[in-house]
Amino acid sequence: MKRIPFFTWLAIALLAGTFVYSAVRLFQARTRTIVAPGTEVIRIAHWQLEPGVREALDAIAQDYMALHPHVRVEQMPIPGRAWVQWLRTQLVGGTAPDLIELASYNNPDDMLARYFTPITAWLEEPNPYNADEPDLRDLPWRRTYAAELVPAPDGFGHYYNANLLEFYGAPSTLVTVRVFYNRDIIRAATGGDRPPQTFEEFVALCEALQQHALRTGEPLMPLGGSVFNITKITDTLFNTVTQKLALELDYGRDLEFSRHETMLSYARGRWSLHTPAVRRSLETIEAFARYLPPGWVQLGREDGMMQFLQGRAAMLATGTWDAGGILMQADFPVGAFQVPPFPRDHPRFGEWTLGPASEAATFAAMPFGLTRNSQHPERAIDFLRFLTSRKSNAKFAEISKWLPVIKGVPVPAGTEAFKPLADGYTTGVNIRVLGGRANDILLQNFHLLSGSGASADNYIARTATQYDRAVLEEIARAARVTHETVRQRDSVLAGLYHTAPPAPRSKFDRLAASQLDSEIQRLQALRVLEDHPLK
């Protein structure tokens, strides 16, 4: 009888072990769904897998369940790459959790209107979990936020939909962009760890780090990261070098050079890639690109994080959503500073610059919305109020190391550098917001703006016609979407008009004003497309 080889038995044992493990996990998952009679289960889903966020939400959920023993809160963290497919499947299948994180780029108007419940009325009521806070107890829930949930321009706030004129989410945090740096490496290279105050000092620091690496033979890069990280720097530089141009182009004269205005003014020829301020903004990449890691265009966000945490990169530009992971995992002291702007008197980049861009308009992030198929909508809203109370928001910020969003909540120790810069000027023109394909064009041709052969002229020659078409395509798409939105809102307006005043009439007035604005924007877009037809 032929003996069965040892490795065959080993493979069989591993297969059997895997089967047993999977069976146990499946049994545990199913038993968790069995709840005692009368227990209300609230499920909350999000894609924030950064260290500290899930722990913070778990801690707050435990506090809530201790206060309400008949309630169970279940957190559902979903990987970002699978989020969109998972979200649509859950909503269409009627199996969506009670609370879902919202983002305007993931939740179009039709999705919000069909699958989510507006929370505007609840936001106008006091938050009972602030009853012990004298300055908050009588305020509407909306006004307990540091920025009082003012609707964001262009819908970038995620929690409010300008077309539907409703609040759909209650945010949990603020996010800013900072350059994180390894204090030990900076001290070794420069003798101190004072963060740079100007762009020239930033470039000088990069040069000092590069020379330090050459002297010591260490495999060290001044700047770590990928395209994801580098665009956090270029966005700041683009937005400051072109500030005066934005003021010239802002025909609404409201200091908010919106995406709509940006695209229409481009299509009308009021500015282009050849405009001196825009051309100069493209040259900013060349000024620091020689300090980027080899192959950075092909690297991913995770690669940049690993470079920094392993001490192979001295600095990393990213959002404060990564702060918790950096501060918890780094085995070295970490500092942070805002991407330094150009001064007005900068010999090369100061001509169209006003100064540091204000972050006062930083809008609240990570909003959770209430789904229409929630079995316990009042309970879900109650938990959302608890999550965004002053006490819970302080705990969330302390554990996650993210910025607080509620009035009076202190910034956690060690994160003071993340606070939004209140003073400053309006932002300028950023070519990355020129329609859906504009960002892809930049990413695909980034190599023309960096390296030994960097040339803004070559970039413009290669991409100008691509931008021309991308902008017109985006204007046409926006006009179609606006037309559909206006059509849908007409029936809502008719219903509100015949509803008894006064409260519904107030909403009618607001919706009518928004409707007129949408129609104006659509007519402007159609006129531009008539004058500059797509070929």
List each language-model region with its residue ranges.
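Conserved C-terminal helix/tail region of periplasmic/extracytoplasmic solute-binding proteins
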Residues: 2-22, 424-535
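Short, well-ordered beta-strand elements
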Residues: 37-51, 71-76, 99, 168, ...
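Short, polar/charged alpha-helical segment
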Residues: 50-70, 180, 184
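Extracytoplasmic/periplasmic substrate-recognition and gating elements
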Residues: 72, 188-189, 303, 328-402
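Short helix-initiation/N-cap motifs at beta->coil->alpha
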Residues: 77-86, 199-201, 296-310
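Hinge/lid segment of periplasmic solute-binding proteins
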Residues: 107-176, 347, 353
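Glycine-centered hinge/linker elements that transmit conformational signals in sensory
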Residues: 203-206, 248-298
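Ligand-binding pocket segment of bilobal, Venus flytrap-like solute-binding proteins
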Residues: 211-214, 273-345, 379-388, 394-395
